Amino acid sequence: MRHLLRTFCVVVLAVLLAPAAFPAERAFPFGQELLLDAQPMRPGKRMPILTIELNGDAKIDLWCRTVPARVELSESAIRIEPGPLPQELPEMQSAGQCTPERIYADEQMLAALAGVTSWRWEDSAVLLFGPTNMTFRAATN
């Protein structure tokens, strides 16, 4: 009887402690603005932001331009199909903000996002993995 009680207590304790030992995977932060963890590119203040909705629709705010995208996402896999970069620059940007360097960075970032294949949480950051790895954090404003 004592052995049975001890075994029962061990099983109950293991069940209670298992979630702490193996925390549940965090879900992807759908609907949140995810800000690229990078140094600002002067002269503008705009930073790339990725927003993915639960239905797979996405908006990618790049250094200068914004493009729509479709995203397929699973536990750890992700595939981003960005729309084409618009030729025209945004009207709402200040003069000189979209420098040739920023326009080139738009093209590079869009290509990097199209190449990601997996994602995961690390602390408070969402990491995207592909030929170019990227770190995004939830926007706090």
Where are these regions (language model features)?
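Lipid interaction determinants
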Residues: R2-R6, V10, V15-N141
